[in-house]
Amino acid sequence: TKYVVIDKIDKEMALVALSPITGRTHQLRLHMHHIGSPIIGDKKYFKNNTNDLQNDKDKFLKLHAAIIKIPDENLLKAHMPKHFKNSLEYYGLNLKKDEYVYNLFLEDKNWKLKIN
C-alpha cells in the first residue's frame, strides 16, 4: 500500500490517500492497522475504543474509494458520501481540493511511503 498524508491533526489523526498495490482483501485496512494508524470506524481491525477519536454520531467506516484507476482506462471518480464529509468537518480535517487528490493519482512521485 502506498499513501500520502493530505491533512493531519497533530499525531492524533490524519486524512490520507491510499493506493493498494496488490488488491488483496482488506489490504488498506490491514496495512493501516499494522503501522499503528487504523482507519476510524473499522470494527474488524480497530477494536480498541479507548483511542477511537470517533466522538461524532456517525459510526461508519471512514474509507472511501474516491478514485479508481483501471490500467489503460480512464480514472473513475466517486463523490464522497455525506457521512464522510460530515466527519471531516467534525474533526477539522481539510480535503483541500478534489483536484489535489485527483492529481496524486496522476503522478507516482507524490507517493511517499510503501507499506509491505
Where are these regions (language model features)?
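Glycine- and acidic-residue-rich catalytic/RNA-contacting loop of pseudouridine synthases
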Residues: 1-15, 30, 44
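Short beta-strand segments enriched for Tyr within beta-sheet-rich domains
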Residues: 24-32
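Pseudouridine synthases involved in rRNA/tRNA modification
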Residues: 31-116
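A structural micro-motif recognizing beta-strand termini
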Residues: 18-21
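Extended aliphatic helical segments
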Residues: 4-5, 16, 67, 101
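Short beta-strand segments
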Residues: 1, 14, 26, 72-78
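Short secondary-structure boundary micro-motifs
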Residues: 1-2, 23, 51-54
